[in-house]
Every structure is written in C-alpha cells, then in structure tokens.
C-alpha cells in the first residue's frame, strides 16, 4: 500500500522532471515530504535528520563510510533496497524506511530510534541510550532540536505535501 501511495504521489508532483534536472533542492524536499507521508513519519523529522546528517548535500560522505542525504551505511542501504546512495530519491526512500523501522523497533521511542540511526540498532538494543557517549547523546539532542524548530514551520510544509497529493487541510 505504501509503495502504491508513493508512486501515486510522485506522479502528482508537477515539477518532478524539471526538478530532477534543474532544481535539485526542490526535488530533495519533495521526496522527503512524499516518503515521510508514505511511511507515516512527520516530514519535519525526516528534514531534521537530513539537515543534521548531510546538510542537504547529496554527495556527503562521512569518515565512517555513510553516504548521501540521509548518510546510509552500505549494509543499511543494501538492507533497505538502496542501489545508489547518491541518488536523491533512492537515498531518501531507504533512509525514511530505515528510520520508520527503527521507530517501530523501539516502540515509538524517538530518542532510542535516533540513537540507533546514528550508532546502529545493535548497540542501542544492547545499551539503550548510552549516556556515557557524548557523540550519540549530542546527535539525538541536535536532531531533536532541529525537529522542534521545523515543527514551528509545519503549516508551510503541510501546504507543500497537500499541493503534491491534491488534498486540503492540515
């Protein structure tokens, strides 16, 4: 069902072809909104993860080998069907699928899900939110702060999603 919704929503994006070639930033924002909706996540959360992970740089590569907008590790990309970690849509789809999976795995605990996104689910399943790791706690706090800030701008984001899906309201 989610896949059909994504296909439908992406066909409704009026500037999809132009966006792919001419307006990469707009295409990235549209993909984030569409996949957030398809996976039942707040678009502001997806945007916050992208902002913190890569600063919206599709070619970002970490010193640990994570790549693309949502900084997917090779094994995570493979597990979630991402063929090209530098492809905007492929990376966002895989990253949002992974984030949604983590939120379910940690029974809605966003802090644990974000810690797992940063450090891997095995470590978080073993230790929880390891308060002795300033890097992990700092990451969770940073994404949470950006998420809260973006939620104050939510009405504008909802208008974008609604214009793409042909719905009204918020």
Q: Regions from the language model: what does each represent?
A:
Residues 1-8:
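Sec-dependent signal peptide recognition
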Residues 8-18:
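Hydrophobic h-region of N-terminal signal peptides that target proteins for export
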Residues 19-170:
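Catalytic glycan-binding domains that act on GlcNAc-containing polysaccharides
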